[in-house]
UniProtKB/Swiss-Prot annotation:
Lineage: Archaea, Thermoproteota, Thermoprotei, Thermoproteales, Thermoproteaceae
UniProt pathway annotation: Cofactor biosynthesis; adenosylcobalamin biosynthesis; cob(II)yrinate a,c-diamide from sirohydrochlorin (anaerobic route): step 6/10
Species in which this protein is naturally found: Pyrobaculum aerophilum (strain ATCC 51768 / DSM 7523 / JCM 9630 / CIP 104966 / NBRC 100827 / IM2)
Transmembrane segments: none
GO MF entry, a single one: cobalt-precorrin-5B C1-methyltransferase activity
Sorted UniProt keywords: Cobalamin biosynthesis, Methyltransferase, S-adenosyl-L-methionine, Transferase
GO biological process, one term: anaerobic cobalamin biosynthetic process
PANTHER family, alphabetized: COBALT-PRECORRIN-5B C(1)-METHYLTRANSFERASE (PTHR35863:SF1)
Pfam families attached to this UniProt entry: CbiD
Gene3D superfamilies the record matches: CbiD-like
Catalytic reactions on record: Co-precorrin-5B + S-adenosyl-L-methionine = Co-precorrin-6A + S-adenosyl-L-homocysteine
EC number: 2.1.1.195
Listed name of the protein: Cobalt-precorrin-5B C(1)-methyltransferase
Database matches in InterPro entries: CbiD (IPR002748), CbiD_sf (IPR036074)
Entry similarity comment: Belongs to the CbiD family.
Length: 340
C-alpha cells in the first residue's frame, strides 16, 4: 500500500478526543491537543479546535479527519460536553447525533446512535482525567450531513452515527487495496494451503481467534480475493463475514460495497420463502431497513435464513473454481453459522 496515503480518525475517536479535552478543561487545563487510546493498542493525538463553558458544563470540539478516504463527514466538528461526577461515566447523545428507530442495529431503538465500541473509547478517554462524568456528544452539522449517509435508510433519524471499531480509518484506494490483498495472499501461500479471508474488523478478529496471524482483510473485494486465491494455488478459501455483507454475497454480488449493490432484505425474503415462512412474516420483513432488522423480524426463522444465505454465497463464490467455506459472525465476533 502507498505509504504516502493518509489515515484518518473515526467519529468515535473524534468523540473520545473531544470528551477528554472537555474533561481536561473542567480541571482548568486548556489543551491544544489530546492523546487518546484506541481498541487496537495505539494512542492517537488529535488537535482540539476550541474549548468553552456552559455554566457548570465544559465543552470541547475536534474536527474529524478522514485522511485519503472519500468521506462526506471529513472535517465535521464533533463536540463533547462534560459535567464532572463523583464516579461513573454516563454517555448521552445530543444535537446532530441520530436516534435509532428500528431494531437490528448495535444500538437499540430509542437510543442515540453511539455504537458500543465508541462508547467504550469515550469512557476510557474520560477516565484518564476524571473519576466520573456525564458526557453529551453533539455534532452541530449532523442533521444536515445525515441526509448524505445511509442513516435515513437504516431508520436512524436526526443526525449521524458515532461509529468505529478501531478508531482509525485506513486510506481507501481501489488499486492500492487490491494490490495489498494480492501481496498478502502471495506472501502467505508458502505457509498455508487455505486462504483465510475476513471482510471487516469484527470478522478479522473472529478469524484471528480461530486461525491466528494468517488472516487477510479484504473489505468488500470478496470476488477478487477468492479469484486471486484460486490463481495462487490455494486448495480452499475460508471467508469470515457478517449478515449484512452475507446477504449481498447470497445474491451473487462479488463486491459488497453499498455503491455496487444492495438488495440485502430481498436476500432474506428469498431465504424465508425457501423456508416456507408464513405470509405475515414475509410482509413484516419486507418493511425492514437493514438485515439486522430483517433477521429480528424473522424470529425463529433467522437461523435458517443465515444458513441458506451462507450456502448460496458459497455456491456463487465457488464459481471461481476453488472450494469455499463461509463463517458468519455477529457484532460480538461470535460465529453464528459455518458451512464447514
Amino acid at each position: 500500500m502507498n505509504p504516502f496515503l493518509k489515515y484518518g480518525i473515526t467519529t468515535g475517536l473524534a468523540a473520545a478526543a473531544a470528551a477528554k479535552a472537555a474533561a481536561l478543561y473542567s480541571k482548568g487545563i486548556v489543551p491544544k491537543s489530546v492523546t487518546v487510546p484506541t481498541p487496537i493498542g495505539l494512542r492517537v493525538e488529535v488537535f482540539v479546535e476550541r474549548v468553552f463553558q456552559r455554566g457548570e458544563i465544559y465543552c470541547a470540539e475536534v474536527r474529524k479527519f478522514s485522511g485519503d478516504n472519500p468521506d462526506v463527514l471529513n472535517g465535521v466538528i464533533i463536540r463533547a460536553c462534560v459535567r464532572p461526577l463523583n464516579n461513573g461515566v454516563v454517555i448521552k447523545g445530543g444535537e446532530g447525533v441520530g436516534i435509532v428507530t428500528r431494531p437490528g442495529l448495535p444500538v437499540p431503538p430509542g437510543e442515540h446512535a453511539i455504537n458500543p465500541v465508541p462508547r467504550r473509547m469515550i469512557e476510557e478517554a474520560v477516565r484518564e482525567v476524571l473519576e466520573g462524568a456525564e458526557v453529551l456528544v453533539e455534532v452541530p452539522d449532523g442533521k444536515l450531513l445525515a441526509e448524505k449517509t445511509m442513516n435515513p435508510r437504516l431508520g436512524i433519524v436526526g443526525g449521524i452515527s458515532i461509529l468505529g471499531t478501531t478508531g482509525i480509518e485506513a486510506p481507501v484506494s481501489a488499486d492500492e487495496f487490491l494490490g495489498h490483498i494480492e501481496a498478502e495472499l502471495s506472501a502467505l501461500r508458502e505457509r498455508r494451503d487455505i486462504a483465510i479471508l475476513a471482510q471487516g474488523n469484527t470478522s478479522y478478529k473472529a478469524a484471528q481467534a480461530v486461525f491466528g496471524d494468517v488472516v487477510v482483510k479484504i473489505g468488500d473485494m470478496v470476488g477478487y480475493a477468492v479469484e486471486k486465491a484460486a490463481a495462487l494455488g490455494y486448495k480452499a478459501a475460508y471467508l469470515f463475514t457478517m449478515p449484512g455483507k452475507l446477504a449481498k454475497l447470497a445474491l451473487g454480488a462479488y463486491n459488497t460495497h453499498s455503491a455496487q449493490c444492495d438488495g440485502r432484505v430481498e436476500a432474506v425474503l428469498y431465504a424465508l420463502v425457501k423456508l416456507r415462512a408464513p405470509y405475515e412474516v414475509l410482509l413484516e420483513v419486507s418493511n425492514a431497513a437493514s438485515v439486522g432488522e430483517a433477521l429480528a423480524k424473522a424470529g425463529d426463522y433467522a437461523g435458517g435464513v443465515i444458513a441458506i444465505m451462507a450456502r448460496r454465497a458459497k455456491e456463487y463464490l465457488e464459481r471461481f473454481k476453488i472450494p469455499v467455506e463461509i463463517y458468519v459472525v455477529n457484532d460480538k465476533g461470535e460465529v453464528l453459522f459455518s458451512t464447514t
